[in-house]
């Protein structure tokens, strides 16, 4: 009795690079996590689909960590982005490659990624989208912390000053020092109130601090795109 092929699953290409003569080594984001697979005949029709931001349906074969692409089809229009929206999409992809463990299912991350791509393509403001994605990714990976309470379970005070103890939470401090956050900013972040003065810039600093320890010492290449003229 012949064995039926594995079911196809929704996927996005995070990164692709040449592999051997005519193949490509592709990192995919799926509801089942980040999967790496060999795409054969990458110079043909399949190769034109193996690019970021195209909603795909992919059949993966093989039980090892390195799989093979059995079938790959587009299931919608590619998300068209240019300029800083494109750089933002590439930033999301690099974050996922660096932070998401291989074959560790995170369906909520997949859904939020797809929704964020659509919002970027629609021209929505970039900073709130990026901060929301970073925060939810950290939370889904188990690295999240409360913005309403500190590490002693005390409510964040509007007039308080706080520093981030990575993987622990917010600690109230009483002496000025670099890298602090005020309570007003933190409470605005908790409500996603990006109209509050200083909330977006503080959220960017907070996410940088929270992500840094998990990214290691190697800088994100995609961040450099924003700095180029």
From Swiss-Prot:
This is DNA repair protein RecO. GO terms for biological process: DNA recombination; double-strand break repair. Involved in DNA repair and RecF pathway recombination. Keywords: DNA damage, DNA recombination, DNA repair. Belongs to the RecO family. It comes from Pseudomonas fluorescens (strain Pf0-1). HAMAP family: RecO (MF_00201). GO terms for cellular component: bacterial nucleoid. The gene is recO.
């Amino acid at each position: 009795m012949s064995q039926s092929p594995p079911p196809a699953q929704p996927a996005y290409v995070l990164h692709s690079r040449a592999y051997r003569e005519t193949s490509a080594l592709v990192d995919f984001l799926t509801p089942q996590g980040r999967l790496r697979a060999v795409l054969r005949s990458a110079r043909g029709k399949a190769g034109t689909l193996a690019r970021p931001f195209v909603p795909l349906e992919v059949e993966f074969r093989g039980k090892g960590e390195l799989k093979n692409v059995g079938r790959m089809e587009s299931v919608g229009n590619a998300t068209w982005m240019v300029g800083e929206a494109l750089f933002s999409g590439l930033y999301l992809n690099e974050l996922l490659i660096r932070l998401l463990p291989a074959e560790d299912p995170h369906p909520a991350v997949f859904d939020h990624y797809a929704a964020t791509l659509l919002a970027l393509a629609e021209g929505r403001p970039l900073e709130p989208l990026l901060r929301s994605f970073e925060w939810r990714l950290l939370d889904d990976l188990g690295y999240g912390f409360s913005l309403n309470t500190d590490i002693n379970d005390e409510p964040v005070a509007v007039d308080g000053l706080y520093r981030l103890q990575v993987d622990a939470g917010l600690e109230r401090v009483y002496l000025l020092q670099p890298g602090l956050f005020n309570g007003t900013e933190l409470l605005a972040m908790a409500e996603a109130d990006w109209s509050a003065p200083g909330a977006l810039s503080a959220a960017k600093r907070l996410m940088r601090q929270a992500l840094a320890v998990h990214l290691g010492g190697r800088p994100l290449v995609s961040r450099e795109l924003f700095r180029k003229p």
